[in-house]
Amino acid sequence: MAKVLYITAHPHDEATSYSMATGKAFIESYKEANPNDEVVHIDLYKENIPHIDADVFSGWGKLQSGTGFEELSESEKAKVGRLGELSDQFASADKYVFVTPLWNFSFPPVMKAYLDSVAVAGKSFKYTEQGPVGLLTDKKAIHIQARGGYYSEGPAAEMEMGHRYIGIMMNFFGVPSFDGIFVEGHNAEPDKAQQIKEDAIARAKEAGKTF
């Protein structure tokens, strides 16, 4: 039985969000094909995702110097403890499904905060004499992203930094398989928006069967 993290970063639900609608189609198809797998939905707009701030750096520094966890301040314990929970959960999963919109050429900031929380030496990667090495070499990931314009090719392609960033992080973590499903062009061509959405959902359903 595999453990799947369904990680969404959108303030809207599938009724109004193209990425969330496509993500829902994917994960429902996946669950139908893999009824015994565990799927955990992490809604980044509802979960507590601490930003790495002064409390976190202070807490980490104290722990590294030998201070016990219970000796940290209340704010340090809350944030450092939560980051530990998130990184442990991420490292223990087998598959990752990321769902985001493309906002200002990237993704909502809460996704960056989440990726920061799981980029932990000793869990998702390790340091060696040859440099950092990813530890999640038996995992797979997919990113479902809605883009109002066209970013797969043409002059705007180099401006897309959301999917590319997640791909870079997965590569850094050692994840050998990273794919994408894109819903694009619905704002550029609103008369085709419904068909664009339906086509993406169809592709998502097929991909979910074999993920």
From Swiss-Prot:
Pfam families hit by this protein: Flavodoxin_2 (PF02525)
Annotated keywords: Aromatic hydrocarbons catabolism, Detoxification, Flavoprotein, FMN, NAD, Oxidoreductase
Catalysis performed (reactions): 2 a quinone + NADH + H(+) = 2 a 1,4-benzosemiquinone + NAD(+); N,N-dimethyl-1,4-phenylenediamine + anthranilate + 2 NAD(+) = 2-(4-dimethylaminophenyl)diazenylbenzoate + 2 NADH + 2 H(+)
Temperature curve summary: Activity increases linearly up to 40 degrees Celsius. Stable up to 55 degrees Celsius after incubation for 30 minutes at pH 7.5. During incubation at 25 degrees Celsius for 16h, the enzyme is stable between pH 5.5 and 9.0, where 80% activity is observed.
Result of knocking out the encoding gene: Deletion mutant is sensitive to 2-MHQ and catechol.
Amino acids binding FMN: S17, Y18, S19
InterPro entries linked to this entry: Flavodoxin_fold, Flavoprotein-like_sf, FMN-dep_NADH:Q_OxRdtase_AzoR1, NADH:quinone_OxRdtase_FMN_depd
EC number: 1.6.5.-, 1.7.1.17
Induction: Repressed by MhqR. Induced by thiol specific stress conditions, such as exposure to 2-methylhydroquinone (2-MHQ), catechol or diamide. Not induced by oxidative stress due to hydrogen peroxide or methylglyoxal.
UniProt subunit comment: Homodimer.
NCBIfam families: PRK13556.1
Family of this protein: Belongs to the azoreductase type 1 family.
HAMAP family: Azoreductase_type1 (MF_01216)
PANTHER family: FMN-DEPENDENT NADH-AZOREDUCTASE 1, FMN-DEPENDENT NADH:QUINONE OXIDOREDUCTASE
Protein name: FMN-dependent NADH:quinone oxidoreductase 2
Name of the gene: azoR2
